[in-house]
Amino acid sequence: EPAPVKPLHMDEETAEGAAASVYYFLDLYRYAYMTGNTTELEAMSENGCKFCRSTIDNATNLHNAGGWNDKWEQEVTNVRYYEKLEGYDYNRVEASVSHQMITSHPGGGVATETSSPTKNELLDFAVRHTNGRWMIGGVRVEQQ
């Protein structure tokens, strides 16, 4: 599976750049579980991002055990950028994510697992522009 392509203007310090970074992060998230390659995901994740660290660790552990996830279809909609509030270090980007069923092959002789599709799951990203690129400082799944 080829690595996701970086969107044009992704590194610009604009609302469009921040939104493009979120799209790219979500593509890298899927790519990490499919291939075990977390290099680009790590490069755009701040150290304090628990969601990012968990994703990197889980994808790495899955692949170290000989497992992988099949590619799944995902749709990202309603991406909204919010200017950072005075006194805060991060801008906010909100996105609705829907995905088809995910099939995981854990490896080590463990049976294949599937997860249910989701529809319009709301994700809240804390992003900031640092050293010429957008970094992900945190991701929260909103309870609906």
Describe the predicted segments one by one.
Residues E83-Q144:
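Exposed beta-sheet edge and beta->alpha loop/turn motif
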Residues E1-D70:
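Core segments of small alpha/beta cavity-forming domains
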Residues L28-T38, V76-V93:
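N-terminal short leaders/motifs
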